[in-house]
Amino acid sequence: MITQDKEFMSAAINYAREAALRGDVPVGAVIVQKGSGTECGTDRIISAGGNRKSSDPTAHAEMNAIREACRVLDRWNLSDCELYVTLEPCPMCAGAIVQARMRRVVYGCADPRAGAAGTLYNILNDSRLNHRCVITSGVLAEESKALLINFFRERRDKKITCTYHTGTNGSTMTM
């Protein structure tokens, strides 16, 4: 595993932690522009994002990072950029990655329910589409997976009580 991949994935994991603190699913992403740093030939993070799905079902970490990268660069074509994301992209995000012409996607843990970078679908390398990406999987996978497991475990462990009015006599039932 390339040291730089770990460095950029660590940054994505930090955005995933921020998402969890907001109550969103802990997925984080960063977009790195290749060869754009202050030193000749170095790479730099140009955008980042975490899930913000509480009011927008399309506000996945990848979508937020892509939107921000396009705004920062003032263009839609991100062919000189790489995406680092803690969870394998879903079909929607994979479609956006293809449309943005990103050259490479690096993800942490696989998504057996909606993974579109090879686990369930392989949209990023579908020969019927106009663009394909290099995919690197498993970078800091255990850390990424642990964030998700702990987040959903905490949600399940919180006891939710609901009070139902069961009749006209004012009786209630709490579950």
Regions found by a protein language model. Give the residues of each.
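A short, polar/charged loop-to-alpha-helix boundary motif
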Residues: 53-64
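Zinc-dependent deaminase
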Residues: 1-19, 39-41, 89-175
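Helix-adjacent hinge/juxtasegments
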Residues: 63-100
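Short loop/turn microsegments at loop-to-beta-strand junctions
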Residues: 4, 26-27
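Short beta->alpha transition motifs characteristic of CBS
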Residues: 44-53
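Small-residue (primarily alanine) positions within well-ordered alpha-helices
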Residues: 12, 16-19, 29, 47, ...
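Residues that line or immediately flank small-molecule/substrate-binding pockets and catalytic motifs
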Residues: 33-34, 85, 109
